[in-house]
Design a protein with these regions (language model features):
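A short, well-structured juxtamembrane/interface segment
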Residues: 119-128, 186-188
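Short Lys/Arg-enriched helix C-cap and helix-to-coil transition segments
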Residues: 109-122
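Short hydrophobic/aromatic segments of transmembrane alpha-helices and their interfaces
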Residues: 82, 127, 289-290
């Protein structure tokens, strides 16, 4: 299947994206501004690329913005949707094989750079709600259903899944880094990858690693981590517990038994919330027990992000079974989310919400429909004028 470059609009109309949908043009303007600064995408042959990274990333952002459910859904819309046609199809046309080949072989480096650049741009416009707590990064993983044909996505003998590992900036509530592994891929290695010195990783029990704790401290990286209630500990110094709180334990401790004892002491906090007892450790001596508990409570933001991102941007409706293609789609989903954060902040002073997302989708569709009708009527009028002109010439 080949998608023509111009239908349903005439190529002579030369319609700009802003004319088709001012809303979508404004939404992706920060992306367009970053494109010249990304690593150039070079052709692997002597022929220049027609389906460039610019077309590729616009197509993927449009896919998530409009919540298409498959690549076929997007490609079938291109001949009928003038905005999709302009975003996706170069002047030379686009074949299905070219679209799929691009997503499984190229563009990940550019998208990684784009996520980093957009995250930095967004963070400059948002306020830090808790500056005294320092730079906080929640790290977590989310499973993605995979078909049995995706042999690389190992999970169990009967089920295949991939796993997205995410570094989430809790100071600004923004996704920052992403990696992809098979469903049973190790999580702990990404703490060192995602954390910078002087940052504090906020971690659940799956990331507990005594040797890792010592190594992160040696690297100048901090953490607030939940541990199991039966974790072996030696109390080095008891600390006062604030009255009238859910806290019941606060002490300087050393974790591990004789065979697996940590070199560095930690601070252990115990508290009860909604019937559940939590045990948290941190290497940060500057935090109070209440601050330690509060930092861990902020971790729910990464779980809320995963839920909203997956459900409303259709990020896990995969358009590729190839690991590169899956990673590319996840990165494009992060880019789309960051663009929405910027757009909603600039337009309404709000964070992304389903109500505003639906509003944006309605505006894009209405603007595109109006632009299409206007251009279609102009083509008809031009044709009538030409016909009348020919008739007059014939009669004269």
């Amino acid at each position: 299947m080949s998608i023509l470059s111009s239908p349903p609009l005439s190529g002579d109309n030369n319609v700009e994206m802003n004319s088709l949908s001012p809303t979508f043009s404004t939404l992706i303007a920060p992306l367009e501004a970053q494109l010249p600064y990304l690593t150039p995408l070079a052709s692997r042959s002597n022929r220049p690329l027609d389906y460039t990274f610019d077309f590729q990333v616009r197509a993927l952002v449009y896919y998530h913005t409009e919540a298409f459910t498959s690549a076929q859904d997007l490609l079938q819309a291109a001949p009928e949707d003038p905005l999709a046609n302009q975003l996706i199809v170069p002047s030379t046309g686009l074949g299905e094989s070219t679209f799929y080949e691009a997503n499984v072989t190229r563009g990940s480096q550019q998208l990684l750079e784009l996520v980093d650049r957009l995250a930095k741009k967004v963070s400059k416009q948002l306020k830090v709600p808790h500056p005294a707590l320092g730079a906080l990064v929640a790290i977590d993983g989310s499973l993605i259903d995979a078909s049995l044909s995706m042999g690389w996505a190992e999970y169990t003998s009967t089920r295949h899944k991939a796993k997205a590992h995410l570094g989430f900036d809790l100071n600004w509530g923004l996704p920052r880094q992403l990696a992809l592994t098979e469903g049973n891929g190790a999580e702990r290695a990404f703490v060192s990858t995602f954390l910078e010195p002087d940052e504090t990783g906020v971690l659940d029990r799956g990331y507990v690693d005594y040797q890792g704790f010592d190594r992160w401290i040696d690297e100048g990286k901090h953490f607030v981590a939940r541990i199991r209630k039966n974790a072996h500990r030696e109390v080095l110094e008891s600390r006062p517990i604030p009255p009238g709180t859910a806290l019941f334990f606060f002490a300087k401790v050393r974790l591990g038994d004789e065979a697996h004892r940590m070199r560095h002491p930690l601070f252990l906090v115990g508290f009860k919330s909604r019937g559940t007892i939590y045990w948290l450790v941190t290497d940060r001596a500057d935090l109070s027990a209440e601050q330690i508990a509060f930092i861990f409570a902020l971790r729910w933001e990464i779980e809320s992000f995963f839920a909203w991102w997956k459900k409303h941007l259709e990020v896990y409706h995969l358009i590729s079974r190839n690991p590169h293609g899956v990673l590319l789609q996840l990165l494009a989903g992060l880019v789309t989310y960051l663009l929405l954060v910027l757009y909603f902040h600039q337009q309404y002073g709000e964070r992304p919400s389903l109500r505003r997302l639906r509003q944006v989708r309605r505006q894009i569709r209405q603007e595109t429909a109006i632009a299409y009708l206007t251009i279609y009527n102009m083509d008809i009028l031009l044709a009538l004028i030409l016909i009348l002109g020919y008739q007059r010439q014939a009669n004269s």
